[in-house]
Amino acid sequence: AAKVMLDAADRRGKILDDVARLAAAHGLVPVHDEGLLHEVAGLVEWPVVLLGRIDDAFMTLPPEVLTTTMRHHQKYFSLKDKSGKLAPVFAVVSNMETKDKGAAIVAGNERVLRARLSDARFFWDQDRKRSLAGRVDALKARLFHAKLGSDYDRVQRLRALASELSRYIPNADPVAAERAAELCKADLTTGM
């Protein structure tokens, strides 16, 4: 028999409480994410919170890569240890109670996360092969605006502007300002 919790506020409360309770049982705390909480509460009718594990091999990725992959692609809640370090555990919200207490659901979500994080690792490793400075010329191939030119053209305008503006800021370094402007759009050429 299907179960439904009609009130979205009740679903949010249950998700919040259950994530916190399960995290605390492992000495962890959830990463506060009101937007994700609202989104997930709108996706499920009967929230059942389960915990899954992140393979240790992926814990060397930057925390931002892990949390972005979990949050945006999978709708998982990140957990941290008491020191604030990202834990190799995530919370997933299922839409049903199962006879195996969610074991198959957790296993499936861990498998999907492994695939997502493998992709993320590939792009991260590829991106690290070239410095941001080595990517600036690739901005020439990216159109910023038909009337304003490429992203490279845009960066050149930003460099000139940064240098000029730095003159009006006490102790500002115009060379550093130009360098920051030169690199500020280079990430647009990365896989991440």
PLM feature segments, named:
Residues 1-192:
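Amphipathic alpha-helical "coupling" segments that flank catalytic cores
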